From Swiss-Prot:
Name under which the protein is recorded: tRNA modification GTPase MnmE
Cofactor: K(+)
Pfam families linked to this entry: MMR_HSR1 (PF01926), MnmE_helical (PF12631), TrmE_N (PF10396)
Organism: Mycoplasma mobile (strain ATCC 43663 / 163K / NCTC 11711)
Cofactor comment: Binds 1 potassium ion per subunit.
Family that this chain belongs to: Belongs to the TRAFAC class TrmE-Era-EngA-EngB-Septin-like GTPase superfamily. TrmE GTPase family.
Length: 442
């Protein structure tokens, strides 16, 4: 049983209404000490006043009552709706603390929800992602995780691994019992291969989704005065970078963010690449190549009738494992468009960049965002990959002739990685599985 906590749920600012949340076994008792209205039935709202220690009215409020475990935190909870002034809201909060509540820590209500098994880590992360979503698309994707579909799939993988571990342990420790499945290489290997395939499919559909969800990184590169800064300004729809006819004005990397079709992009405008004697400008060129390394998409800007130089070739080489797009600026000066069919044509002067925007959008929409099995959390995806690698080790071991009692170490690692997505791995689960599924107590 936890102590009773309280906090302002709506932020400490002036607004029409503020909400103060209280959770814990003594929630009703503490609120009753300062509230003149009735204690309502579960999931009802009552009206009354909040009184201070001198029994003077602090505010008139509505109070929502949540009794028992069928609520967000899984314990008695109360929500007080008061007027949204900073002073009055904090007065109510201080009265709750003075009468026995403790000021909640950051995320403590959600932590209690998790500890009381009202949600798992997948949903907890989805809620946090929804709160911090920077785009409508991110918000929609986060909400898709609320139905628990991916949690149910991962739970089935966990159950399968748990069964295999428990059965292997039973074969080792209790070989005399013939009511337990006898796992050997021929029976264990197909089960391992099936799980590996499922995890591999999950990784494939999720890797790109994870990168896109968290924001694709774009680098704008090219010679001086080809329109790099103008393209940055056009994509941002604001004058973020200074545009002049003088070469070498961009010496440091300029970074900004923008959206296309609800997807987030972070973009870097880099120094123009040319032979220089100036140490400062040379440092800017070094930073350009560092930015290419860190980026997902490279926009290589060129102009009509310009010959390639060594820097252009270096850009292509360093962009080998990236999404590389050659952008032809000043398309209004192009006489023969057929010669540049492989390029994306834009005009930064006229802010005509629709072809480029459509191309960037197509990369994002190539993912099935409605697929409930998508994992976009880097943390969750890393756990899936660890499980996949551990099972691959187990598979190789079985194929090379190792017995189940040896590869069980890798199978257990795979299980622990998946359980860490749902919550903390607990070896008691293994014991529970062994003694609940098999007749070992006789």
């Amino acid at each position: 049983m936890f102590d009773t906590i309280a906090a302002i749920a709506t932020g400490n600012s002036i607004q029409a209404i503020s909400i103060i949340r209280i959770s814990g076994s003594d929630s009703f008792k503490i609120v009753k000490k300062i509230f003149t209205g009735k204690i309502g039935k579960n999931k009802t709202i009552t009206y009354g006043n909040i009184l201070n220690h001198e029994r003077k009215i602090v505010d008139e409020v509505l109070v929502a009552w949540f009794e028992g475990t069928n609520n967000f935190t899984g314990e008695n909870s109360v929500e007080i709706f008061c007027h949204g002034g900073i002073v009055v809201t904090n007065l109510v909060l201080q009265l709750l603390i003075a009468n026995g509540a403790r000021l909640a820590e950051r995320g403590e209500f959600s932590r209690r929800s998790f500890l009381n098994k009202k949600m798992d880590f997948v949903k907890a992360e989805a809620i946090n992602d929804l709160i911090h979503a920077k785009t409508i698309r991110q918000a929609q994707i986060s909400v898709n995780k609320f139905d628990g579909k991916i949690s149910k799939d991962i739970e089935s993988y966990i159950d399968t691994l748990l069964y295999l571990i428990a059965t292997c342990e039973t074969n080792i420790d209790y070989p005399e019992y013939d009511d337990v499945e006898n796992l050997h290489n021929e029976t264990l290997l197909p089960k391992i291969k099936e799980l590996i395939q499922k995890l591999n499919d999950l990784i494939k559909i999720s890797e790109k989704a994870s990168i896109i969800y968290n924001g694709l990184k774009i680098a704008i590169v090219g010679k001086p005065n080809v329109g790099k800064s103008s393209l940055l300004n056009a994509l941002l729809n604001e004058e973020r970078a200074i545009v002049t006819n003088e070469a070498g004005t961009t010496r440091d990397v300029i970074e900004a963010s923008f959206q296309i079709d609800g997807f987030l992009f972070s973009i870097s405008d880099t120094a123009g690449l040319r032979e220089v004697q100036n140490n400062i400008e040379n440092l800017g060129i070094q930073k350009t190549f560092e930015t290419i390394e860190k980026s997902d998409i490279i926009l290589h800007i060129i102009q009509p009738n310009e010959a390639e130089n060594d820097f252009d070739k270096q850009i292509e080489i360093k962009s080998k494992n990236k999404i590389y797009l050659k952008i032809l600026n000043k398309k209004d000066l192009i006489k023969n468009h057929n010669k540049q069919n492989h390029m994306i044509k834009i005009s930064t002067l006229n802010k005509d960049i629709i072809e480029l925007e459509n191309k960037l959008s197509s990369y994002c929409n190539d993912v099935e965002w409605d697929n409930p099995n998508l994992i976009y959390s880097q943390n969750q995806l890393s756990m899936i990959k660890k499980s996949y690698l551990a099972l691959s080790e187990a598979k190789e071991g079985l194929e090379s002739g190792l017995t189940p009692d040896v590869v069980i170490i890798d199978i257990t690692k795979a299980w622990e990685s998946l359980v860490n997505i749902k919550g903390k791995a607990d070896n008691e689960l293994l014991l529970d599985k062994m003694f609940s599924n098999f007749c070992l107590g006789k």
